[in-house]
Amino acid sequence: MAKATFAAGCFWGVEDAFRQIKGVTSTMVGYIGGHTQNPTYKEVCTDRTGHAEAVEVEFDPSQVSYKELLAVFFQSHDPTQLNRQGPDYGTQYRTAIFFHDPTQEAEAREAIAALDKSGIFKRPIVTQVVGAPEFYRAEEYHQKYFEKQGIRACHLP
């Protein structure tokens, strides 16, 4: 198994997008990239902890590649919006790829360069590509939120 971590706005919809992918064995929503330990949702929402809402994805590389997960990531949000997605704004909603090894870093940077060059997006991609620091699991009520609520989408593109 391998691990990938992505921030792309509200983590509920992002988690749901990855859960649909064959080869993804588990997902967990949480907080990453901040300067406090064990933050709560309420603390992250103050925009003072520095954390992003993110999804940690465990996957089987023999069934789905990291590049394929990157494609899902870029399709599940607008990577040209800085610190916001749809009606949600603040640094917790930033777009970021948290890599776990040098290959993931290289593939993420290559994907961004290719998308920028393609002209698919009218503005430059602002997705951060950074090494994965400690990931803090979000409260249980956030896990598999769409499944628990019986809904299929929020404001994903």
Segments predicted by a language model, with ranges:
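Flexible coil/turn and secondary-structure edge motifs
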Residues: 1-157
